[in-house]
Design a protein with these regions (language model features):
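N-terminal leader/targeting segments
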Residues: 1-71, 158, 261, 416-418, ...
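Internal transmembrane alpha-helical bundles of multi-pass membrane proteins
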Residues: 5-9, 257-446, 452-457
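Structural detector for short beta-strands of small beta-barrel domains
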Residues: 74-90
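Flexible glycine-rich surface loops and low-complexity tracts that mediate binding to linear polymers
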Residues: 81-82, 118-136
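Short aromatic-glycine-enriched beta-strand elements
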Residues: 90-98
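Beta-strand/loop nucleic-acid-binding surfaces
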Residues: 103-116
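Aromatic-rich juxtamembrane segments at the membrane interface
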Residues: 148-274
Length: 457
Protein backbone atom coordinates (compact mmCIF):
# COMPACT_ATOMS: atom_id res chain seq x y z
CA UNK A 1 0.00 0.00 0.00
CA UNK A 2 3.03 2.31 0.31
CA UNK A 3 3.29 2.42 -3.49
CA UNK A 4 -0.44 3.18 -3.84
CA UNK A 5 -0.34 6.00 -1.30
CA UNK A 6 2.86 7.45 -2.82
CA UNK A 7 1.27 7.57 -6.26
CA UNK A 8 -1.99 9.16 -5.10
CA UNK A 9 -0.21 11.78 -2.99
CA UNK A 10 2.12 12.69 -5.87
CA UNK A 11 -0.82 13.03 -8.25
CA UNK A 12 -2.71 15.30 -5.87
CA UNK A 13 0.41 17.42 -5.23
CA UNK A 14 0.85 18.09 -8.95
CA UNK A 15 -2.83 18.49 -9.83
CA UNK A 16 -2.78 22.31 -9.83
CA UNK A 17 0.10 22.29 -12.34
CA UNK A 18 -0.69 19.32 -14.55
CA UNK A 19 -4.45 18.90 -14.22
CA UNK A 20 -5.79 15.52 -15.29
CA UNK A 21 -2.30 14.41 -16.41
CA UNK A 22 -1.15 14.29 -12.79
CA UNK A 23 -3.55 11.40 -12.22
CA UNK A 24 -3.13 9.82 -15.66
CA UNK A 25 0.70 9.85 -15.79
CA UNK A 26 2.22 10.77 -12.42
CA UNK A 27 0.20 8.37 -10.25
CA UNK A 28 1.07 5.18 -12.20
CA UNK A 29 4.68 6.34 -12.72
CA UNK A 30 5.32 6.91 -9.00
CA UNK A 31 3.46 3.72 -8.10
CA UNK A 32 5.61 1.71 -10.52
CA UNK A 33 8.82 3.27 -9.23
CA UNK A 34 8.05 2.47 -5.59
CA UNK A 35 6.94 -1.06 -6.48
CA UNK A 36 10.17 -1.82 -8.35
CA UNK A 37 12.21 -0.35 -5.49
CA UNK A 38 10.47 -2.71 -3.09
CA UNK A 39 11.34 -5.82 -5.15
CA UNK A 40 14.72 -7.35 -4.40
CA UNK A 41 14.75 -9.09 -7.79
CA UNK A 42 12.40 -9.51 -10.73
CA UNK A 43 10.41 -12.74 -10.60
CA UNK A 44 7.46 -14.00 -12.69
CA UNK A 45 5.25 -14.43 -9.62
CA UNK A 46 5.47 -10.67 -8.93
CA UNK A 47 3.63 -9.64 -12.11
CA UNK A 48 0.06 -10.72 -11.23
CA UNK A 49 0.24 -8.87 -7.89
CA UNK A 50 1.79 -5.85 -9.61
CA UNK A 51 -0.90 -5.67 -12.31
CA UNK A 52 -3.71 -6.16 -9.80
CA UNK A 53 -2.36 -3.41 -7.52
CA UNK A 54 -1.75 -1.10 -10.50
CA UNK A 55 -5.38 -1.55 -11.57
CA UNK A 56 -6.53 -0.75 -8.03
CA UNK A 57 -4.30 2.35 -8.00
CA UNK A 58 -5.72 3.59 -11.31
CA UNK A 59 -9.27 3.14 -9.98
CA UNK A 60 -8.32 5.13 -6.87
CA UNK A 61 -6.76 7.77 -9.11
CA UNK A 62 -9.95 8.02 -11.17
CA UNK A 63 -12.02 8.36 -7.99
CA UNK A 64 -9.82 11.17 -6.66
CA UNK A 65 -9.78 13.08 -9.94
CA UNK A 66 -13.54 12.78 -10.44
CA UNK A 67 -14.19 14.26 -6.98
CA UNK A 68 -11.52 16.98 -7.10
CA UNK A 69 -12.47 18.16 -10.58
CA UNK A 70 -16.23 18.08 -10.00
CA UNK A 71 -17.92 21.43 -9.26
CA UNK A 72 -19.56 21.90 -5.86
CA UNK A 73 -23.33 21.40 -5.60
CA UNK A 74 -25.39 24.14 -7.22
CA UNK A 75 -25.44 27.23 -5.05
CA UNK A 76 -26.72 30.81 -5.39
CA UNK A 77 -30.22 29.57 -4.55
CA UNK A 78 -32.76 30.49 -1.87
CA UNK A 79 -33.61 27.66 0.53
CA UNK A 80 -35.78 27.09 3.60
CA UNK A 81 -34.40 24.30 5.75
CA UNK A 82 -34.00 22.75 9.18
CA UNK A 83 -30.60 21.77 10.48
CA UNK A 84 -28.28 21.15 13.42
CA UNK A 85 -25.21 23.20 14.29
CA UNK A 86 -22.29 20.76 14.30
CA UNK A 87 -19.32 23.09 14.67
CA UNK A 88 -18.57 26.62 15.89
CA UNK A 89 -15.03 27.93 15.44
CA UNK A 90 -13.30 31.29 15.47
CA UNK A 91 -12.55 32.45 11.93
CA UNK A 92 -10.44 35.58 12.02
CA UNK A 93 -12.67 38.34 13.38
CA UNK A 94 -15.88 36.33 12.93
CA UNK A 95 -17.21 32.86 13.76
CA UNK A 96 -17.65 30.01 11.31
CA UNK A 97 -20.78 27.99 12.07
CA UNK A 98 -21.35 24.68 10.26
CA UNK A 99 -25.00 23.65 9.87
CA UNK A 100 -25.92 20.12 8.84
CA UNK A 101 -29.24 20.48 7.00
CA UNK A 102 -31.76 17.68 6.67
CA UNK A 103 -31.83 17.43 2.88
CA UNK A 104 -29.00 19.51 1.35
CA UNK A 105 -25.94 18.52 3.38
CA UNK A 106 -23.63 20.85 5.29
CA UNK A 107 -23.20 24.59 4.86
CA UNK A 108 -21.05 27.12 6.68
CA UNK A 109 -22.23 30.56 7.70
CA UNK A 110 -20.02 33.36 9.03
CA UNK A 111 -21.36 35.38 11.96
CA UNK A 112 -20.02 38.39 13.81
CA UNK A 113 -21.11 36.88 17.12
CA UNK A 114 -21.36 33.24 18.23
CA UNK A 115 -25.16 33.22 18.27
CA UNK A 116 -25.37 29.42 18.13
CA UNK A 117 -23.79 26.58 20.07
CA UNK A 118 -23.07 23.01 18.98
CA UNK A 119 -26.21 20.91 18.93
CA UNK A 120 -28.60 23.84 18.40
CA UNK A 121 -31.41 22.95 15.99
CA UNK A 122 -32.74 25.77 13.86
CA UNK A 123 -35.33 26.39 11.18
CA UNK A 124 -34.07 29.03 8.78
CA UNK A 125 -34.27 30.54 5.34
CA UNK A 126 -31.38 32.02 3.43
CA UNK A 127 -29.30 31.97 0.27
CA UNK A 128 -26.34 29.79 -0.59
CA UNK A 129 -23.22 30.78 -2.51
CA UNK A 130 -19.97 29.23 -3.65
CA UNK A 131 -16.77 29.51 -1.67
CA UNK A 132 -14.43 32.44 -2.18
CA UNK A 133 -11.95 31.83 -5.02
CA UNK A 134 -8.34 31.36 -4.03
CA UNK A 135 -6.41 34.63 -4.06
CA UNK A 136 -3.19 34.63 -6.17
CA UNK A 137 -1.01 35.81 -3.26
CA UNK A 138 -2.45 33.33 -0.75
CA UNK A 139 -1.89 29.61 -0.24
CA UNK A 140 -5.23 29.17 1.52
CA UNK A 141 -8.00 27.62 -0.56
CA UNK A 142 -11.36 28.09 1.17
CA UNK A 143 -13.17 25.60 -1.06
CA UNK A 144 -10.70 22.78 -0.43
CA UNK A 145 -10.58 23.48 3.30
CA UNK A 146 -14.34 23.23 3.75
CA UNK A 147 -15.01 20.52 1.15
CA UNK A 148 -12.51 18.29 2.98
CA UNK A 149 -14.93 18.60 5.91
CA UNK A 150 -17.97 17.74 3.83
CA UNK A 151 -19.27 21.32 3.55
CA UNK A 152 -21.04 22.12 0.27
CA UNK A 153 -21.07 25.92 0.29
CA UNK A 154 -21.59 29.16 2.21
CA UNK A 155 -24.97 30.09 3.66
CA UNK A 156 -26.30 33.59 4.37
CA UNK A 157 -29.12 33.24 6.91
CA UNK A 158 -31.93 35.80 6.66
CA UNK A 159 -34.37 34.51 9.31
CA UNK A 160 -34.19 31.71 11.83
CA UNK A 161 -35.92 30.23 14.85
CA UNK A 162 -34.62 27.68 17.32
CA UNK A 163 -36.26 24.26 17.48
CA UNK A 164 -36.44 21.76 20.36
CA UNK A 165 -33.14 19.98 20.85
CA UNK A 166 -32.63 16.42 19.66
CA UNK A 167 -30.06 13.93 20.82
CA UNK A 168 -26.98 14.32 18.61
CA UNK A 169 -23.24 14.00 18.91
CA UNK A 170 -22.93 17.78 18.58
CA UNK A 171 -25.35 18.31 21.49
CA UNK A 172 -23.40 15.84 23.63
CA UNK A 173 -20.17 17.67 22.81
CA UNK A 174 -21.72 20.97 23.88
CA UNK A 175 -23.02 19.53 27.18
CA UNK A 176 -19.61 18.08 28.01
CA UNK A 177 -17.89 21.35 27.12
CA UNK A 178 -20.29 23.28 29.35
CA UNK A 179 -19.78 20.88 32.27
CA UNK A 180 -16.03 21.20 31.99
CA UNK A 181 -16.30 24.99 32.04
CA UNK A 182 -18.45 24.88 35.19
CA UNK A 183 -16.69 22.24 37.28
CA UNK A 184 -13.04 22.39 36.21
CA UNK A 185 -10.32 24.99 36.85
CA UNK A 186 -9.86 27.22 33.81
CA UNK A 187 -6.63 25.78 32.38
CA UNK A 188 -7.64 22.17 33.00
CA UNK A 189 -11.02 22.82 31.38
CA UNK A 190 -9.31 24.16 28.25
CA UNK A 191 -7.04 21.13 27.93
CA UNK A 192 -9.86 18.66 28.55
CA UNK A 193 -12.16 20.41 26.07
CA UNK A 194 -9.46 19.96 23.43
CA UNK A 195 -8.91 16.30 24.35
CA UNK A 196 -12.53 15.28 24.96
CA UNK A 197 -14.57 17.19 22.37
CA UNK A 198 -11.96 18.72 20.04
CA UNK A 199 -12.67 22.30 21.13
CA UNK A 200 -9.64 24.59 21.15
CA UNK A 201 -9.36 27.68 23.32
CA UNK A 202 -7.85 30.47 21.20
CA UNK A 203 -5.54 31.85 23.90
CA UNK A 204 -4.25 28.39 24.80
CA UNK A 205 -3.79 27.53 21.14
CA UNK A 206 -1.81 30.74 20.55
CA UNK A 207 0.50 29.94 23.46
CA UNK A 208 1.18 26.44 22.18
CA UNK A 209 1.96 27.89 18.75
CA UNK A 210 4.64 30.03 20.43
CA UNK A 211 6.10 26.86 21.96
CA UNK A 212 5.79 24.76 18.79
CA UNK A 213 3.51 22.25 20.53
CA UNK A 214 0.07 23.15 19.16
CA UNK A 215 -0.30 19.63 17.75
CA UNK A 216 -0.89 18.47 21.34
CA UNK A 217 -4.23 20.31 21.31
CA UNK A 218 -5.42 18.74 18.04
CA UNK A 219 -7.08 15.37 18.51
CA UNK A 220 -4.66 13.01 16.80
CA UNK A 221 -3.01 9.63 17.10
CA UNK A 222 -1.56 10.77 20.43
CA UNK A 223 -5.02 11.20 22.00
CA UNK A 224 -6.58 8.20 20.24
CA UNK A 225 -3.67 6.03 21.37
CA UNK A 226 -4.02 7.14 25.01
CA UNK A 227 -7.77 6.44 24.98
CA UNK A 228 -7.23 3.01 23.40
CA UNK A 229 -4.54 2.14 25.94
CA UNK A 230 -6.83 3.10 28.84
CA UNK A 231 -9.70 1.11 27.30
CA UNK A 232 -7.44 -1.94 26.93
CA UNK A 233 -6.46 -1.61 30.59
CA UNK A 234 -10.12 -1.92 31.65
CA UNK A 235 -11.55 -4.20 28.93
CA UNK A 236 -8.56 -6.26 27.86
CA UNK A 237 -8.55 -7.41 24.24
CA UNK A 238 -12.30 -7.43 23.62
CA UNK A 239 -12.26 -6.18 20.01
CA UNK A 240 -15.95 -5.23 19.88
CA UNK A 241 -15.88 -3.08 23.02
CA UNK A 242 -12.55 -1.51 22.08
CA UNK A 243 -13.85 -0.68 18.59
CA UNK A 244 -17.01 0.93 19.98
CA UNK A 245 -15.03 3.04 22.46
CA UNK A 246 -12.55 3.98 19.74
CA UNK A 247 -15.11 5.32 17.25
CA UNK A 248 -17.39 6.92 19.83
CA UNK A 249 -14.37 8.92 21.03
CA UNK A 250 -13.33 9.88 17.49
CA UNK A 251 -16.79 11.15 16.52
CA UNK A 252 -17.25 12.80 19.91
CA UNK A 253 -14.15 14.90 19.23
CA UNK A 254 -15.34 15.95 15.78
CA UNK A 255 -13.74 13.23 13.62
CA UNK A 256 -10.62 15.23 12.71
CA UNK A 257 -8.59 13.75 9.81
CA UNK A 258 -5.68 12.92 12.13
CA UNK A 259 -8.02 11.14 14.55
CA UNK A 260 -9.69 9.24 11.71
CA UNK A 261 -6.28 8.12 10.45
CA UNK A 262 -5.31 6.86 13.91
CA UNK A 263 -8.68 5.18 14.35
CA UNK A 264 -8.38 3.31 11.05
CA UNK A 265 -4.87 2.10 11.90
CA UNK A 266 -5.99 0.82 15.30
CA UNK A 267 -9.11 -0.74 13.77
CA UNK A 268 -7.01 -2.56 11.18
CA UNK A 269 -4.82 -3.85 14.01
CA UNK A 270 -7.86 -5.02 16.01
CA UNK A 271 -9.42 -6.75 12.99
CA UNK A 272 -6.14 -8.52 12.24
CA UNK A 273 -6.39 -10.09 15.69
CA UNK A 274 -9.85 -11.45 14.87
CA UNK A 275 -8.71 -13.01 11.59
CA UNK A 276 -5.43 -14.25 13.05
CA UNK A 277 -3.26 -12.24 10.68
CA UNK A 278 -0.20 -10.19 11.56
CA UNK A 279 -0.69 -6.45 11.06
CA UNK A 280 2.23 -4.65 9.42
CA UNK A 281 2.43 -1.12 10.82
CA UNK A 282 3.61 0.73 7.68
CA UNK A 283 1.05 -1.06 5.55
CA UNK A 284 -1.68 -0.17 8.07
CA UNK A 285 -0.74 3.52 7.95
CA UNK A 286 -0.78 3.52 4.14
CA UNK A 287 -4.10 1.67 4.04
CA UNK A 288 -5.63 4.24 6.38
CA UNK A 289 -4.26 7.07 4.24
CA UNK A 290 -5.66 5.59 1.03
CA UNK A 291 -9.09 4.97 2.60
CA UNK A 292 -9.30 8.57 3.79
CA UNK A 293 -8.25 9.94 0.39
CA UNK A 294 -10.90 7.84 -1.32
CA UNK A 295 -13.50 9.04 1.20
CA UNK A 296 -12.52 12.71 0.81
CA UNK A 297 -9.74 13.48 -1.73
CA UNK A 298 -9.65 17.10 -0.55
CA UNK A 299 -8.04 15.87 2.67
CA UNK A 300 -4.70 15.92 0.86
CA UNK A 301 -4.70 19.73 1.18
CA UNK A 302 -5.45 19.53 4.91
CA UNK A 303 -2.20 20.18 6.78
CA UNK A 304 -3.42 18.05 9.69
CA UNK A 305 -3.91 15.03 7.43
CA UNK A 306 -0.46 15.39 5.85
CA UNK A 307 1.32 15.81 9.18
CA UNK A 308 -0.60 12.90 10.64
CA UNK A 309 0.30 10.52 7.81
CA UNK A 310 3.96 11.60 7.75
CA UNK A 311 4.32 11.22 11.52
CA UNK A 312 2.66 7.82 11.52
CA UNK A 313 4.84 6.58 8.64
CA UNK A 314 8.03 7.60 10.45
CA UNK A 315 6.95 5.98 13.71
CA UNK A 316 5.80 2.79 11.97
CA UNK A 317 8.95 2.46 9.86
CA UNK A 318 11.22 3.11 12.85
CA UNK A 319 9.57 0.59 15.13
CA UNK A 320 9.44 -2.00 12.38
CA UNK A 321 13.22 -1.61 12.09
CA UNK A 322 13.66 -1.93 15.86
CA UNK A 323 14.56 1.72 16.53
CA UNK A 324 14.51 3.07 20.08
CA UNK A 325 11.45 5.06 21.15
CA UNK A 326 13.86 7.79 22.33
CA UNK A 327 14.69 8.55 18.70
CA UNK A 328 11.04 8.75 17.63
CA UNK A 329 10.16 12.28 18.70
CA UNK A 330 13.18 14.07 17.13
CA UNK A 331 12.74 12.05 13.93
CA UNK A 332 9.05 12.98 13.66
CA UNK A 333 9.97 16.64 14.24
CA UNK A 334 12.57 16.56 11.46
CA UNK A 335 10.01 15.16 9.03
CA UNK A 336 7.07 17.41 9.90
CA UNK A 337 8.56 20.83 10.69
CA UNK A 338 9.22 21.77 7.01
CA UNK A 339 5.52 21.26 6.22
CA UNK A 340 4.53 23.42 9.19
CA UNK A 341 7.08 26.09 8.22
CA UNK A 342 5.81 26.13 4.63
CA UNK A 343 2.18 26.49 5.75
CA UNK A 344 2.63 28.99 8.58
CA UNK A 345 5.82 30.78 7.52
CA UNK A 346 8.08 29.51 10.31
CA UNK A 347 8.19 27.24 13.35
CA UNK A 348 9.62 28.01 16.81
CA UNK A 349 12.99 26.34 17.25
CA UNK A 350 12.14 25.64 20.89
CA UNK A 351 9.45 23.23 19.69
CA UNK A 352 12.16 20.81 18.52
CA UNK A 353 13.36 20.66 22.14
CA UNK A 354 10.01 20.68 23.94
CA UNK A 355 8.58 17.94 21.75
CA UNK A 356 11.23 15.56 23.06
CA UNK A 357 9.30 15.22 26.32
CA UNK A 358 5.98 17.06 25.83
CA UNK A 359 4.05 13.99 24.53
CA UNK A 360 5.07 11.92 27.56
CA UNK A 361 4.28 14.80 29.92
CA UNK A 362 0.82 15.33 28.46
CA UNK A 363 -0.04 11.65 28.18
CA UNK A 364 0.26 11.39 31.97
CA UNK A 365 -1.25 14.82 32.69
CA UNK A 366 -4.31 14.31 30.47
CA UNK A 367 -4.90 10.80 31.82
CA UNK A 368 -4.84 12.02 35.43
CA UNK A 369 -6.91 15.09 34.53
CA UNK A 370 -9.54 12.91 32.81
CA UNK A 371 -9.73 10.56 35.78
CA UNK A 372 -10.02 13.51 38.16
CA UNK A 373 -12.74 15.11 36.03
CA UNK A 374 -14.82 11.92 36.08
CA UNK A 375 -14.48 11.73 39.87
CA UNK A 376 -15.42 15.40 40.12
CA UNK A 377 -18.55 14.90 38.01
CA UNK A 378 -19.48 11.98 40.28
CA UNK A 379 -18.97 14.30 43.29
CA UNK A 380 -16.36 12.13 44.97
CA UNK A 381 -15.04 13.62 48.23
CA UNK A 382 -11.87 15.68 47.87
CA UNK A 383 -11.93 15.37 44.06
CA UNK A 384 -11.73 19.16 43.82
CA UNK A 385 -8.30 19.05 45.45
CA UNK A 386 -7.11 16.53 42.86
CA UNK A 387 -8.24 18.93 40.13
CA UNK A 388 -6.32 21.78 41.77
CA UNK A 389 -3.21 19.58 41.70
CA UNK A 390 -3.82 18.87 38.00
CA UNK A 391 -4.24 22.59 37.36
CA UNK A 392 -0.87 23.12 39.00
CA UNK A 393 0.64 20.51 36.67
CA UNK A 394 -0.57 22.39 33.60
CA UNK A 395 0.63 25.70 35.07
CA UNK A 396 4.04 24.12 35.67
CA UNK A 397 4.17 23.12 32.01
CA UNK A 398 3.53 26.73 30.98
CA UNK A 399 6.40 27.91 33.20
CA UNK A 400 8.75 25.30 31.74
CA UNK A 401 7.73 26.07 28.16
CA UNK A 402 8.04 29.84 28.67
CA UNK A 403 11.49 29.36 30.21
CA UNK A 404 12.83 27.38 27.25
CA UNK A 405 11.12 29.72 24.77
CA UNK A 406 12.95 32.66 26.35
CA UNK A 407 16.27 30.80 26.03
CA UNK A 408 15.66 29.87 22.38
CA UNK A 409 13.66 32.69 20.75
CA UNK A 410 14.61 31.49 17.26
CA UNK A 411 12.37 30.40 14.40
CA UNK A 412 13.05 28.09 11.46
CA UNK A 413 11.73 29.08 8.03
CA UNK A 414 11.04 26.93 4.99
CA UNK A 415 13.83 26.65 2.40
CA UNK A 416 15.60 24.07 0.28
CA UNK A 417 17.55 22.72 3.26
CA UNK A 418 14.48 22.21 5.45
CA UNK A 419 12.59 20.63 2.53
CA UNK A 420 15.44 18.20 1.95
CA UNK A 421 15.79 17.42 5.66
CA UNK A 422 12.09 16.64 6.02
CA UNK A 423 11.64 14.56 2.88
CA UNK A 424 15.11 13.05 3.16
CA UNK A 425 14.47 11.83 6.71
CA UNK A 426 11.12 10.31 5.73
CA UNK A 427 12.69 8.66 2.67
CA UNK A 428 15.57 7.33 4.77
CA UNK A 429 13.29 5.53 7.22
CA UNK A 430 11.03 4.19 4.47
CA UNK A 431 14.12 3.04 2.55
CA UNK A 432 15.29 1.20 5.64
CA UNK A 433 11.82 -0.33 5.93
CA UNK A 434 12.05 -1.51 2.28
CA UNK A 435 15.55 -2.84 3.04
CA UNK A 436 17.16 -0.81 0.24
CA UNK A 437 20.93 -0.59 -0.15
CA UNK A 438 22.50 2.53 1.46
CA UNK A 439 23.58 4.04 -1.89
CA UNK A 440 20.10 3.60 -3.32
CA UNK A 441 18.57 5.23 -0.22
CA UNK A 442 20.96 8.19 -0.58
CA UNK A 443 20.07 8.63 -4.25
CA UNK A 444 16.34 8.48 -3.58
CA UNK A 445 16.70 10.94 -0.67
CA UNK A 446 18.33 13.48 -2.97
CA UNK A 447 15.72 13.10 -5.71
CA UNK A 448 12.78 13.27 -3.30
CA UNK A 449 14.19 16.29 -1.47
CA UNK A 450 14.75 18.22 -4.71
CA UNK A 451 11.29 17.25 -5.99
CA UNK A 452 9.65 18.41 -2.75
CA UNK A 453 11.37 21.79 -3.00
CA UNK A 454 10.30 22.16 -6.64
CA UNK A 455 6.70 21.23 -5.82
CA UNK A 456 6.29 23.91 -3.16
CA UNK A 457 8.55 26.59 -4.70
Amino acid sequence: MLAVLSGLVSGAALYDRLGVWSFVLVVPAVFTGVMFLSYESEAPEHWPAFLFTLTFTLLCSWRMYSVISSPPPENAVFIAEEGTVTEVREWGKVYAVVIDTESRGKFVTFLKFANFTMGTRIKFDGATRDFQPKFPDSDFDEARFWRARGVNGVMSIYNHEELPERVSMAAVRQKISRKLAIYMPALTASYLRAAWVGGRDKNLNDRHKQWGTSHLLAVSGFHVGVVTFIAMFFFGKDVVILSIILWVYIFLTGAAPSAMRAGLIIQIFLLSKIFGRKSESVNSVCSAGVILLLWSPFLFWDIGWRLSIMSALVIAAMFQNGASWLATSPSVNLVTFPQVAYTFGSVPFVGLLLNLFAPIYFSFALTIASLGAVLRFMKFPFSQYLMLAVEGTFMLWEKIADFFASLLPLTVSWNFLTAWIGCGTLTFFLGRYLDLAPLRIAAVMGVVGFTAFALFL
